[in-house]
Amino acid sequence: MNITKRNGEVEVYNNEKISIAIKKSFISTGKDVSDSEIAGMVSEVEQFIKENPELRTVEDIQNRVEKCLMAHGHYDEAKNYILFRYQRNEQRQAINYIVWTADDRELADVLHNVAREYRERSYSMVTLQEKFSSFTKPGMSQKDSIEALIKAAVELTTPEAPAWEMISARILSYRSEKKITRLEEELGLKTFYRKVKYMTEEGLYGDYILQNYSEEEINEAATFIDPERNKLLNYSGLDLLLKRYVIKNYSGKVIERVQEMFLGIALHLAMPEEKEGRLMWVRRIYDLLSKLEVTMATPTLSNSRKPSHQLSSCFIDTVPDSLDGIYRSLDNFSQVSKFGGGMGMYFGKVRATGGNIRGFKGVAGGVIRWMRLVNDTAVAVDQLGMRQGAVAVYLDVWHKDLPEFLQLRTNNGDDRMKAHDIFPAICYPDLFWKMAEEDMNQNWSLFCPNEIMRIKGYCLEDCYGEEWERKYLDCVNDQRLSRRVISIKDIVRLVLRSAVETGTPFTFNRDTVNRANPNAHKGMIYCSNLCTEIAQNMAPIETVSKEVETKDGDTVVVTTTRPGEFVVCNLASLSLGRLPLEDEEKMKEKVATVVRALDNVINLNFYPVPYAQLTNQRYRSIGLGISGYHHALAKRRIKWESEEHLQFMDKVFETINRAAILASSNLAKEKGSYQFFEGSDWQTGAYFDKRGYDSAEWQDVRKTVALQGMRNAYLLAVAPTSSTSIIAGTTAGLDPIMKRFFLEEKKGSMLPRVAPELSDETYWMYKSAYLINQKWSVRASGVRQRHIDQAQSMNLYITNDFTMRQILDLYLLAWKEGVKTIYYVRSKSLEVEECESCSS
């Protein structure tokens, strides 16, 4: 028996549809009804259809359902059913109008699916049609009509109707897929393999994919693609992917689908795996990325699968105290910036203003003039005009040039001493905070590092903790050393004034960092990176010799350098708002996959400078972080300002840490440990002792690590994720949201931003960052830090009514709680720039 649909098409009769319609009418009134009574009414309708073949249309059947409900005395249900039919009819008419106006019949399927999935009145197609009508003009092209429809859906997004950002993404996805399909047909790209081959020949795809995978493997991998996962993307995320991440041809047309992008990244990151099980890892990585459970850092997301595969986010260099060394560091920065990386530079070894040079007294110009060169390099090397370079410059709080350094970005003072395009950061020892807490009026001595080395025979910056304190006090008491004496109150005033005015300097608590360093047997950590989440061993690059040699008849100058430790950050983030955080077994599996992927980045990466490659291969450091922190709390109805928050995240980060350590150890068993495992805190067990990991479960992990080793010297680092959190449709990094809803202006239109999964239930869980008591954020950071071997991009949010004392108290609390770094101090009246390199 066949039924005629409204559009004239014929389909096979299905009594289940009648049963569902009747059930929904009872659900709408909350009235109970037995299955037998529903079955009886379905039979009556069915009998009518059999007896009246001329009335076998959808409309006639629905009329009969109405009469059947009333015949059984279910008048309220019949009334709601009639209303439902009316609304459905309205929806159909609205969809027909949109499809007719846009002259795009295929669009009807998209809109009907949306209408089925979003049944609330606030997401009616009638509402969309009315908004769309206000943007249409006579004679509009199909392209412009679809643009107008997308704009209409975007502008309907409000706190009361947040799902319009998902609906607008559906229409945007439809438009994008249709354009790509048309392009594929023009080029004859009928399979994924043909497409990869074409993009490789065009220089859009790295040839290494075809060199490592057969045609059969690539086409099998293509079966992993699930187009339904496009529905997970909101408008902002999909728009960002289409504009900045998917591959475009040389005419600027998008040629790569979003799901193909995720698969291409997975194919690249799984390349080092054994051929036999490699496609399994491709699938696992693809699943994590396409489900938005994990985001790779911006360089990895953008450059994987491409010819220029620079996959690392941030780099850190120790600037030596020599002309050759300083200019080498500048060159290193320019190369890193050229390929889209961000930079951290430690200037604590460079002699201060008034220092000696080759015996000439008082002639050194200090660090500021070199930092101005760094600033100019950041502006000049602007990544093909895309954006200028980004760099944080670190200086110790006892360096003689500190007062001028603290005014680098402020608006007052001599402009010749300014560098407005770099980000200053200060390295603090425990002693400074102790003295600040005891008595702000105490004096603090500032020294030249070169003079200390020349007179005392040691480098103060090369030690930490009690040893540093002993040597610093020795310097204070040695009258042979010149110094600048300034009260701690004046230093704090300069720091806080700059923080409120510019958001910087960033904070690096050097003793806290180095005490927790699992690889202290191999070096010092002088500073962090651009976004303050990396903490790894550092050492300056040194020139050993310059020799003139003859090679193949040519005279060449050969410079020999000792490579030092040039830190590299390979980042990814777990999207906490999308993960089963309470299921430890599932978390172990997902963490193991992303740790493997990050470890493979080390082998696959293109390195802008050779020193970075050497350090990365020796330490094999990775930085697994998180995004969606506030999202995860809100969806579980956990308030930010609560002990429940601290307890929950303590458990979550312990779970992530344990999973990451086991994953790295299992990788070491399979592929070998990093070069310096012997003697590390991992090997001796000191890592576990320092963190109080003494449960039976942790003791098993400790034994496993001692037996198998560790593949990676450093594991966890929480980056800001400002861009990639938009892709994942979640909150950025560790930050609380600024607003539940706001409008962002982009190219003349207003883009709505909505807190993830905003609803009546989550609304009050999303308290604004500026309304949150910052002590809760600092305490939470301390709780997490125990489980993070590196550091966190943690911001402080202050309002105009904060006093300097209140801000200082937050710094002191962070130090006491064991927080390693503080990123921006975000004043409500201040807009600070985002780092995109570390956006994982």
Task: Please report, for each region that a protein language model flagged, where it lies by residue.
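Function-dense linear segments that define catalytic or interfacial modules
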Residues: 247, 253, 260-278, 282, ...
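Short, surface-exposed, low-complexity cationic segments
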Residues: 14-32, 107-121, 263-270, 732-737
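Core nucleic-acid recognition elements
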Residues: 9, 36-263, 280-286
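Alpha-helix capping and helix-loop boundary segments enriched in small/acidic/polar residues
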Residues: 9-13, 33-36, 98, 102, ...
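Catalytic alpha/beta core of large soluble enzyme barrels
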Residues: 217-220, 226, 231-239, 532-536, ...
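Internal maturation/activation junctions in enzymes
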Residues: 288, 330, 590-613, 639-721, ...
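Polar, glycine-rich mid-to-C-terminal structural blocks
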Residues: 407, 422-495, 499-502
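Terminal amphipathic helices with adjacent charged low-complexity linkers/tails
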Residues: 80-85, 164-196, 428, 514-536, ...
